[in-house]
Amino acid sequence: CTVIENAAEEPEICDLADFLREMGADITGDGTDAITIMGGKELHGAVHEVIPDRIEAGTFMAAAAITGGNILLENIREEHLKPVIAKLAECNVKTEAVPEGLRVSRKGRLHPIQLKTMPFPGFPTDMQAPFMSLMAVAKGTSVITETVFENRFIHAGELQRMGADIKIDSRSAVIEGVETLTGTKVKATDLRAGAALILSALAAKGETEISDIYHIERGYYKIDEKLRALGAEIERKDVH
């Protein structure tokens, strides 16, 4: 018997446990901070459908929010996105559960918020950078506090190049919303930073060129094609 203490409670952990149980494993406690595994069983094959990517869903919700768009997200699990949905509501973004999925829309300017990242079921650290893009064009002062990872505000410098007013103080970022951002050449420094730059580019005036997009491709499958399908002017090109 193995007991994993201080275990992550994220939906992805529960999904992995579900998969292993389907293969014959004896696992209990997933979704809590203590997981118990009874070893010694021979595992067998299984067919398993992986849960939808809640961070990709959250990123598209943020895309609708920053552009003032109206999109329908299919195949998502609302219970995995509760903290994101709650913060979007504070931002003046409407989410509505419909038979086909979740509809996301905004009328009027984004509102500023106070946000603190936490392990699940708190606000996900992977949505911190996309929300910084939202707050950069909100009306008023927002504060984001990062409690999960160190040095996770690297994207702030690239957003500043687009005209964002962001000040970093240790684990907190203070964002004064501006009317508009301006397109320029920026660099994706990591996966979620790259997503944040795409969001800001969608809302910015003029053209934005994002380099080092291999970071983005690590976590978003054909994001340019999906955004084009929603009406975005975005194209991938080789730069030599």
Place the predicted regions along the sequence by residue.
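Short, structured segments at the rim of ligand-binding sites
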Residues: 1-240
